[in-house]
């Protein structure tokens, strides 16, 4: 059955500012030493005071359905293991850190013992230092080798922004160590003329799983000197590796371990995770290795005031008689505006790239009515920007030039934002783990912080803001991934065979599902068995068989038609719904109209315009069951698990009037369907059961959709 997913109006009437303009801004302290003077904590607004001012306008107080106060926590120090080089300890002390927290010292001890370890503590608890200190100490030891690279380390980040930020931190921390530590980023933004230097001379390489999958492992002979000296693999923000993406990354790591063994190395894995359920179990599933867990957070924490915020009603009887609330997008933009006027450094998290752009634009427009000098202190931050734009935003955020930022989850991860006073979360992000990760971005210097969850106008968000115990009294979720998924495993077996012929001894590394998948790959003539090994048979690159993030295809370049200027990129899957012909595209406060989308050449041509409407794509999704592997009774129905094919197609787009959200018209689109074969869970019911539940055919689709949301 196919369903149409119609996002609610994303832009509506904007209420006037409800706070008195504040002419001073509050400087923020960095996590470590800063060139800027550190402010007196007493001069910073308390979280309660900030929330009080946000709620001081007419009807504002009634929008707060609950306020949770998390008390401050004192820290517990320890000493570094005596095997850490004194030069490294001195470098850490130069950054203003005299003693480690107990969990940092414990993690370093495990790393030096050769135990793979996962540090699963709260945001801003110093996880980076826990793995950096043993890594730097080992690199310093290795610098005595004749080639100066007797030890190397590989850092994996889920985003380019986090890798670039970590590279800055490593350079700052290791500066007193001279050239013994040579960190370098190796990703899609790295100029080609720099790549050879990284391969030959860098001993701390920061990259992402995508580059490891497509760039490093297929070219492993060019990385031989690096790989044979590889002592540590650091996997930052490992809780983000879940679902299909996490399953792909798990297989990429198995390929890495296999290639390392070919060069005689067996690296220790150091993982950093947000607070999660059973982090050691998830880390073992990800790496395929036994992993020690360090989860007792001994760092100090400032007070956190967490408010649940429900936007006001705009209509008592909207579509189909249901009441309608003001959109979370508009409400979040108001709060970001108010916080900026107060001089409170803030980030507003939103799920979509378009939402981040909208919140930024709305906030800038409202700030222009109060103080035009504040307009340039608010911006959007999302994926798809050009590297130079992204780096400039990160510099401005790091320096304090930006007061307010509307960001996607690209900033949810551990990029050092030098401490924030407040975080506004536009709609429940889907998991409690992600909610706490976003909320934890505030107060990173140990000071008090404010977090506000703004509810979207949907049943789940409404339930959560009126049942705070569902958020505050329940543990975070486990990280779920399935490396044995045959649709994930198959392309990685091909990639592994292309890197090095695949032997029987390798199959244990890749898991028991190999026995079923390998014959299928042989039948498809992708692999051929010769003597005692399987070989890749095609001319094309095996690593190109799969996109580990599930997007597929080449990134689509967004180009200004009149000038030929490249504005940014979007992955092919998202291009269908965001840069189709006729779409309104937002980029750093400017509005563009998409004139054409060429999927063959991966180019969307746009021109600057100011249409009086926004656009929303409509799509259909159909799921076909290919094979049922497991089926068990589940109440009156059946619960099933097996292989499915998912087909999605963008079929049209709506034009909605700005401010009111009124639908002006619908335009059909002729875009190709996209299919994905994967594994799924589904339940089945009979017509008799539907009749007993009094569900008639007209509401069946909506009922199933509601059941889907309830189950996840």
Feature names for model-found ranges:
Residues 30, 54-95, 99-102, 106, ...:
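Helicase motor core with emphasis on the C-terminal RecA-like subdomain
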Residues 5-6:
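Short hydrophobic targeting helices and cationic amphipathic motifs
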Residues 39-64, 352, 588-597, 601-603:
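Structured, non-catalytic alpha/beta "coupling" segments that mediate domain-domain communication
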Residues 448-451, 457-472, 482, 492-503, ...:
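Extended Lys/Arg-rich polyanion-binding regions
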């Amino acid at each position: 059955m196919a369903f149409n997913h119609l996002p609610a109006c994303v832009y509506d009437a904007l209420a006037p500012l409800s706070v008195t303009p504040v002419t001073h801004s509050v400087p923020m302290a960095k996590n470590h030493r800063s060139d800027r003077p550190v402010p007196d904590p007493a001069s910073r607004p308390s979280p309660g005071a900030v929330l009080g001012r946000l709620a001081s306008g007419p009807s504002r107080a009634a929008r707060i359905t609950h306020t949770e106060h998390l008390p401050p926590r004192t820290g517990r120090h320890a000493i570094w293991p005596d095997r850490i080089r004194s030069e490294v300890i001195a470098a850490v002390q130069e950054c203003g850190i005299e003693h480690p927290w107990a969990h940092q010292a414990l993690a370093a001890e495990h790393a030096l013992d050769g135990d793979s370890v996962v540090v699963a503590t709260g945001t801003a608890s110093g996880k980076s230092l826990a793995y950096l200190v043993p890594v730097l100490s080992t690199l310093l030891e290795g610098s005595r080798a004749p080639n100066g690279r007797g030890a190397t380390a590989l850092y994996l980040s889920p985003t380019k922004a986090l890798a670039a930020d970590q590279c800055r931190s490593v350079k700052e921390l290791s500066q007193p160590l001279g050239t013994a530590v040579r960190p370098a980023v190796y990703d899609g933004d790295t100029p080609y003329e720099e790549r050879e230097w990284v391969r030959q001379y860098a001993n701390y390489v920061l990259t992402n799983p995508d580059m490891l999958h497509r760039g490093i492992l297929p070219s492993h002979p060019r990385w031989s000197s690096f790989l044979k000296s590889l002592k540590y693999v650091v996997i930052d923000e490992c809780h983000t590796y879940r679902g299909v993406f996490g399953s792909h990354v798990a297989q990429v790591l198995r390929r890495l371990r296999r290639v390392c063994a070919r060069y005689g190395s067996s690296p220790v894995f150091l993982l950093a995770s947000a607070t999660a359920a059973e982090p050691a179990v998830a880390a073992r599933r990800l790496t395929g290795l036994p992993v020690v867990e360090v989860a007792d957070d001994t760092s100090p924490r400032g007070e956190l005031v967490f408010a649940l915020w429900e936007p006001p009603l705009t209509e008592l009887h909207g579509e189909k008689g249901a009441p309608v609330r003001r959109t979370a997008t508009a409400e979040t933009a108001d709060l970001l505006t108010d916080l900026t006027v107060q001089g409170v450094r803030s980030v507003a998290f939103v799920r979509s790239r378009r939402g981040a752009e909208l919140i930024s634009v709305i906030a800038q427009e409202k700030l222009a009515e109060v103080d035009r000098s504040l307009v340039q202190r608010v911006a959007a931050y999302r994926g798809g920007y050009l590297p130079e734009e992204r780096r400039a935003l990160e510099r401005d955020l790091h320096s304090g030039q930006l007061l307010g930022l509307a960001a996607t989850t690209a900033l949810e991860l551990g990029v050092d934002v030098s401490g924030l006073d407040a975080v506004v979360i536009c709609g429940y992000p889907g998991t409690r783990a992600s909610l706490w990760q976003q909320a934890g971005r505030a107060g990173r210097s140990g000071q008090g912080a404010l977090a506000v969850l703004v509810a979207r106008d949907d049943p789940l968000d409404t339930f959560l803001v009126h049942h705070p115990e569902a958020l505050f009294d329940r543990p975070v979720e486990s990280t779920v991934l399935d490396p044995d998924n045959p649709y994930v495993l198959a392309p990685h077996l091909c990639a592994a065979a292309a890197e090095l012929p695949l032997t029987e001894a390798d199959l244990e590394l890749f898991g028991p599902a190999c026995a079923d998948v390998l014959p299928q790959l042989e039948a498809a003539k992708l692999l051929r068995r010769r003597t005692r090994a399987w070989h890749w048979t095609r001319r094309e690159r095996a690593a190109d068989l799969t996109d580990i993030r599930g997007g597929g295809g080449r990134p689509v370049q967004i180009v200004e038609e009149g000038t030929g200027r490249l504005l940014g990129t979007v992955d092919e899957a998202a291009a269908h719904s965001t840069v189709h012909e006729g779409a309104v595209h937002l980029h750093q406060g400017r509005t563009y109209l998409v004139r054409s989308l060429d999927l063959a050449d991966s180019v969307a041509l746009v021109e600057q315009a100011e249409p009086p409407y926004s656009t929303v794509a409509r799509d259909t999704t159909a799921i076909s069951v290919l094979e049922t592997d497991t089926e068990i009774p589940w109440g009156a129905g059946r619960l099933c698990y097996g292989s499915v094919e998912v087909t999605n197609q963008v079929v049209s787009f709506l034009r909605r009037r700005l401010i009111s959200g009124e639908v002006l018209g619908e335009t059909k689109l002729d875009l190709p369907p996209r299919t994905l074969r994967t594994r799924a869970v589904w339940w089945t019911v009979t017509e008799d059961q539907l009749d007993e539940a009094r569900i008639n055919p007209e509401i069946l689709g909506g009922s199933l959709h509601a059941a889907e949301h309830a189950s996840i």
